[in-house]
Amino acid sequence: MALRGWRLFGLAGTILVYIGGILFLSFVSLQSPQQKRNHARGYGEFETLRNRDLGLLGKKPPLQWCTELRYMDSPPPSPKAYKLLQTFPVNDGHQKSSNGRELTALVSFPGSGNTWLRYLLQQSTGILTGSVYKDYGLLKSGFPAENVANSSVLVVKTHEWGPQAWAPYGKAILLVRDPEKAILAEFNRQSGGHVGFASPDRYRRTKGRYWTQFVKNKLWAWEQTNLSWAKNFTGDVKLVFYDDLVENVEGTLRSILKFLNFPVNDELLACALMRKEGIYRRKKRILQFDPYSPAMHTAIDEKRSEVYAALGRFRSH
């Protein structure tokens, strides 16, 4: 009798395991195609970005700095340090400087490498850079002085132009990038963030009308940003071409620091060069099509030639 009871118990257990297995397999097989596509998307064009910029569990790895970041009027860190430090929060209660130092704008059309240059300047000086904007993504990822626009920071990021935009500044660094590449970078930023990319179907939205109007509007803004600061701003202007920065990071940084009257620390500069890529420079991605129409290319070529000639840059590309 006892033996029969054990057999019934074992049979019942087997049936329960069998039913549980069927339910599990049914749940897996009913997963929607969209969910499966989302799960597998990392193996496509975004895989490199995801692996490079995101750590375990999809979180960004902490930025590493060559020394502690500080405001201009804060005491320097102890001499021990040019070891690599992780991003740290800056005290929000810090009393901003009123030291009378001339405020310097770091100006560019969006998509011209402003964030990357800010990163390089922070690495090579240990001094925070500010901004007229408050980008929460940057605020949490290495730029704790976002929305600080006074002389407590090394430079202040802006994309604005005109008398009101110029008024606070005594000097300006004007970062200029080829409009074809800058417009594309800005389109990618609006679609995919500071280091992401626009998907190909974004260019074809509304049968291409959105992209066509975007190029027209941004080409005009590119011209206005660069010419207004170069020709109408009454303070000293340091022209920096993005291509020159890419080709000669050290020389360009040295010339910028000289313009800022900021002493070069060779150890920090060497560390900055070692870590020059950071996470704020969008990696190249080769599109399988040309997003610019022949008419767009013609308009861009004409405007590039006009602006570059006005800036004293006489090569066409």
UniProtKB/Swiss-Prot annotation:
Regions annotated as coiled coil: none
GO annotations of cellular component type: membrane
Carbohydrate attachment residues: 150, 226, 232
Topology relative to the membrane: Single-pass membrane protein
Pfam families the record matches: Sulfotransfer_1 (PF00685)
GO molecular function, one term: sulfotransferase activity
Predominant cellular place of this UniProt entry's protein: membrane
Localization terms from the record: Membrane
Alphabetic keyword roster: Glycoprotein, Membrane, Transmembrane, Transmembrane helix
Matching InterPro entries: P-loop_NTPase, Sialate-O-sulfotransferase, Sulfotransferase_dom
Membrane-traversing stretches: 8-28
Family: Belongs to the WSCD family.
PANTHER family linked to this entry: WSCD FAMILY MEMBER CG9164
Record protein name field: WSCD family member AAEL009094
